[in-house]
Amino acid sequence: MRVGVLTGGGDCPGLNAVIRAVVRKGIEVHGWDFVGFRNGWNGPLTGDSRPLGLNDVEDILTRGGTILRSSRTNPYKVEGGVDKIKQVLADQGVDALIAIGGEDTLGVAKRLTDDGIGVVGVPKTIDNDLGATDYTFGFDTAVSIATEAIDRLHTTAESHHRALVVEVMGRHAGWIALHSGLAGGASVILVPERHFNVDQVVSWVERRFEKEFAPIIVVAEGALPEGGEEKLLTGEKDAFGHVRLGGIGTWLADEIAHRTGKESRAVVLGHVQRGGTPTAYDRVLATRFGLNAVDAVADGDFGVMVALKGTDIVRVKLSEATAELKTVPVERYQEAEVFFG
């Protein structure tokens, strides 16, 4: 059997650990051949590929990013895209695909399965917002990076007695903001799931100043003020219809400065949350996902995604994997509110 592997969507720490586990088990246990398709779905669309052997994955466990590179290519936006993929797979003798990605990549995987291509999905997103799995790799690393940044920002904020607004990733789900804010001792945490009242935020900030402390406000990029709109870096959309969010941190810092008369600055962590070495947790989770994806291919169980349920790796239908996002529930946010102000 010959199996194709690809990584789609935004990169995150742990992708290489999945690739390594897939190739190691596929070759050493089953004797399969592997081909890596470059740049997400663009690889099987155009035939851009490379062989994947044991030597190719020998030293990639701890590396961030992906040796296969990635893109946000949507083959269903390309005329004749599905037929092109089928032809490339036939030409290269590929019997099945393992697609590693988030909601968009897995949504394509589901549609390709419906169109007769054997695909197994592996969930990937630093946002941790896929509803069919308890956790996705990359999330723990992103939270660790954001928490370290918050820890460092506390000292500079206190030295100058200023407010610092830390903008983290999170388009529709505020898991990174919630976890890093709690771990980093933030004075306020703002998430997309709950539109915030600016007056209330200012009140929490002023209360912190009154206690002679410098407030740290952690805000997800998709957070919204009541009656407000998303802050966009650009109105352009990618192949899946997503706009680039950004700017809520700067906007909020300006509002705080204007309303309190106190110096306030914004810090946008941006893509640093995606980069670098994955944590031990993410390496292990990514490895387990890869091993179990190989099992699904061996069983001929296509149209599924491997997922974490409790401490077990299970399989769920791709239709279930992309059905809904996992957002921060009210009770989890209320836990964090105890520490506001």
From Swiss-Prot:
GO terms for biological process: canonical glycolysis; fructose 1,6-bisphosphate metabolic process; fructose 6-phosphate metabolic process. Non-allosteric. One of its GO terms (cellular component) is 6-phosphofructokinase complex. It catalyses: beta-D-fructose 6-phosphate + diphosphate = beta-D-fructose 1,6-bisphosphate + phosphate + H(+). Its EC number is 2.7.1.90. Its cofactor is Mg(2+). Transmembrane segments: none annotated. The record marks K124 as: Important for catalytic activity. Mg(2+) binds at E103. Diphosphate binds at G10. It holds the Pfam family PFK. It is found in: Cytoplasm. Keywords: Cytoplasm, Glycolysis, Kinase, Magnesium, Metal-binding, Transferase. GO terms for molecular function: 6-phosphofructokinase activity; AMP binding; ATP binding; diphosphate-fructose-6-phosphate 1-phosphotransferase activity; fructose-6-phosphate binding; identical protein binding; metal ion binding; monosaccharide binding. Its main location: cytoplasm. The record marks D104 as: Important for catalytic activity and substrate specificity. Substrate binds at T125, I126, D127, R162, M169, G170, R171, E221, R265, H271, V272, Q273, R274. The active site is at D127. Pathway: Carbohydrate degradation; glycolysis; D-glyceraldehyde 3-phosphate and glycerone phosphate from D-glucose: step 3/4. Belongs to the phosphofructokinase type A (PFKA) family. Mixed-substrate PFK group III subfamily. Catalyzes the phosphorylation of D-fructose 6-phosphate, the first committing step of glycolysis. Uses inorganic phosphate (PPi) as phosphoryl donor instead of ATP like common ATP-dependent phosphofructokinases (ATP-PFKs), which renders the reaction reversible, and can thus function both in glycolysis and gluconeogenesis. Consistently, PPi-PFK can replace the enzymes of both the forward (ATP-PFK) and reverse (fructose-bisphosphatase (FBPase)) reactions. Homodimer or homotetramer. HAMAP family: Phosphofructokinase_III (MF_01976). This is Pyrophosphate--fructose 6-phosphate 1-phosphotransferase. It comes from Amycolatopsis mediterranei (strain S699). The gene is pfp.
